């Protein structure tokens, strides 16, 4: 599923939303860390936390904790911000930074806003 920036004006199914989220994670990790480190992150998450890439949308809290363990809280928050900005852009949503929010909070908000689309 290829979506262009700000293209989604319609409600996405949960499966399509999940694919868009994983795509945003892929692109963001590549952008921030590079392809080799992205692959290492996925391998580490799968082998040490039993989180395969395709389960990230359903296990977002565990994914976020895995990033925090791998990189520390502050760097993982920066990575999460890149991911969420990319996801919001793909969904045509406006990103508003909230100091106490983590990646799962933003994704929950995006899911709610997606469900409200017709």
Predicted segments, located by residue:
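Long, compositionally biased intrinsically disordered regulatory segments in eukaryotic proteins
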Residues: 1-118
